[in-house]
């Protein structure tokens, strides 16, 4: 679920940036998304959105699905349980790892999506 996703982000980025800083970043980080991603981090969000879309096609509810995971060496690791839980956990874990590798550009936070996306 979204709270677990936030915790995964903190695991992967070693708590270096609050989760809320990713909620209104670029064209895809946060609710919805459209246009061309502004950078690598925004592409991580686009991929995460697409993954959630695939989860929904499988009949899962990714924003609400609870799953089991651990933070091991700043890497989110999913604990297999059931199809929806595994799929959503993998979406979130891959996004959290992607966020940790991508550069955060302050100029891409809270942008005007109508003109830039």
Curated annotation (Swiss-Prot):
Reaction equations catalysed: a 1,2-diacyl-sn-glycero-3-phosphocholine + H2O = a 1-acyl-sn-glycero-3-phosphocholine + a fatty acid + H(+)
Binding site for Ca(2+): 28, 30, 32, 49
Disulfide bonds: 11-71, 27-117, 29-45, 44-98, 51-91, 60-84, 78-89
GO molecular function: calcium ion binding; calcium-dependent phospholipase A2 activity; phospholipid binding
EC number annotated for this UniProt entry: 3.1.1.4
Keyword Metal-binding: yes
SUPFAM superfamilies: Phospholipase A2, PLA2
Record-linked Gene3D superfamilies: Phospholipase A2 domain
Co-factor(s): Ca(2+)
Active site positions, chain numbering: 48, 92
Keyword vocabulary terms for this entry: Calcium, Disulfide bond, Hydrolase, Lipid degradation, Lipid metabolism, Metal-binding, Secreted
Gene Ontology cellular component terms for the protein in this record: extracellular region
Reported function: PLA2 catalyzes the calcium-dependent hydrolysis of the 2-acyl groups in 3-sn-phosphoglycerides.
Family: Belongs to the phospholipase A2 family. Group I subfamily. D49 sub-subfamily.
Protein name: Acidic phospholipase A2 PA-1G
Taxonomic source organism: Pseudechis australis (Mulga snake)
